Amino acid sequence: MLLLHRAVVLRLQQACRLKSIPSRIYIQACSTNDSFRPQYPSLTFSGDNSSTRGWKVMGTLLGLGAVLAYQDHRCRAAQESTRIYTKEEVSSHTSPETGIWVALGSEVFDVTEFADLHPGGPSKLMLAAGGPLEPFWALYAVHNQSHVRELLAQYKVGELNPEDKVAPTVETSDPYADDPVRHPALKVNSQRPFNAEPPPELLTENYITPNPIFFTRNHLPVPNLDPDTYRLHIVGAPGGQSLSLSLDDLHNFPKYEITVTLQCAGNRRSEMTQVKEVKGLEWRTGAISTARWAGARLCDVLAKAGHQLCETEAHVCFEGLDSDPTGTAYGASIPLARAMDPEAGVLLAYEMNGQPLPRDHGFPVRVVVPGVVGARHVKWLGRVSVQPEESYSHWQRRDYKGFSPSVDWDTVDFDSAPSIQELPVQSAITEPRDGETVESGEVTIKGYAWSGGGRAVIRVDVSLDGGLTWQVAKLDGEEQRPRKAWAWRLWQLQAPVPAGQKELNIVCKAVDDGYNVQPDTVAPIWNLRGVLSNAWHRVHVFVAP
């Protein structure tokens, strides 16, 4: 049976007068609508010629059909290309039911029929649904080729309204009006201040997270700082000299590079809210990312200002240049012993993955503290000082602390708990997604694992039956020094699906080199701020019949 598009059948009937062609060919109009088929009865041809002649005729028809189909599409595309759509109209087409539309430059495309054919799978294409393709093509440069554009042209339905391409004017009274443009793939938890995470299917695509989809945690509006006038103030030690460092001054210090994973204390908080309500953003599994950072070592800069290790306890306090309308800036601190240890790798970073820091990630300078919770990696760094006590910032003293499940907002005493520094061992499943349908036969499971304090992940265990039986996943990633494992490990497991199984309860848990392991459930580690959420990660999927 030869299946041709309905439009091709019409054109073939018009151009070739199929009823008079000798051979035996059955042509059926292709349609997802069965009611269409009776309009095109079977066309049967017979004759005494050999099968060779029949195949020649079929080849001719196929070639002619392809040409006519292309010509028919070009005609339809030309007729529809004058249609003008607003950005709002495009954004309303985000599902197979409404149609999957995307925009590239000034053109609008309906890629609904192509979604299942997308080489990266429909889920990747759906990330761009209702919006522009450019940010995703920037991540996957292989798309920006002539044959890909030719393929995309087949799905053009119109043009984007020119007014939607004009940049909006900045409202100066809005403290967030000058925030940078963000990648549309990010899953937004808060617009003001901006907080967002990459979707899980993109998070573990690369060992090094691309800058545009690195998770973003902001507490205040993003400052727009001039690199030429920027100065970093380092308060000198008693008898030492305070420093006022420009970017060029920082570049004059020895440059160090280090791969570091940053994780928000609230990563996977959404799982704690399923136990009981907590205060905080509804982070899923994406408040974690990895980058290659470069800059001056904090210990070198502090030594230049006369600081050295002392026998009494001391803390290095950081103040950012982001502030609220009252002038209150974000602040945090780490122990002086960590800051002064060259092996700890604490950086005053000015590069991220070989590029100047993006604004959302601290341009022009931020602190990077390997193995420590993201809250201490102060961005837009403006001032560094050494104090006998930790920072008096709200975010150091009254936030980012863990408590017993029995503590509520009526009984909490923030002074009774230490500030979070190192984080516990963590892992999560990024593929497949919860609720997804997987093929029978074999399932591929992917995810990440990481532990704080430089502790290396030595094993990830995966279960398909909720934890009754386990298999060991394969670990990928850079080899790291013992107790200096600052970056995550990506992991993968290909496992057979048990015959007849209709559902899978997939679970993962990681073990670090201190043999710390994740707890099995959330309830015993629940706390009112929803931090330190590291129970076994669970994904429930269905198996295709």
Swiss-Prot record:
Cofactor dependence: heme b; Mo-molybdopterin
Domain Cytochrome b5 heme-binding: 82-161
Gene3D superfamilies, alphabetized: 2.60.40.650, Cytochrome b5-like heme/steroid binding domain, Oxidoreductase, molybdopterin-binding domain
Sorted UniProt keywords: Heme, Iron, Metal-binding, Mitochondrion, Molybdenum, Oxidoreductase, Phosphoprotein, Transit peptide
Transit peptide: 1-79
GO molecular function: heme binding; molybdenum ion binding; molybdopterin cofactor binding; sulfite oxidase activity
Residues bearing PTM Phosphoserine: S123
Pathway: Energy metabolism; sulfur metabolism
Name of the featured protein: Sulfite oxidase, mitochondrial
Organism: Macaca fascicularis (Crab-eating macaque)
High-level lineage: Eukaryota, Metazoa, Chordata, Craniata, Vertebrata
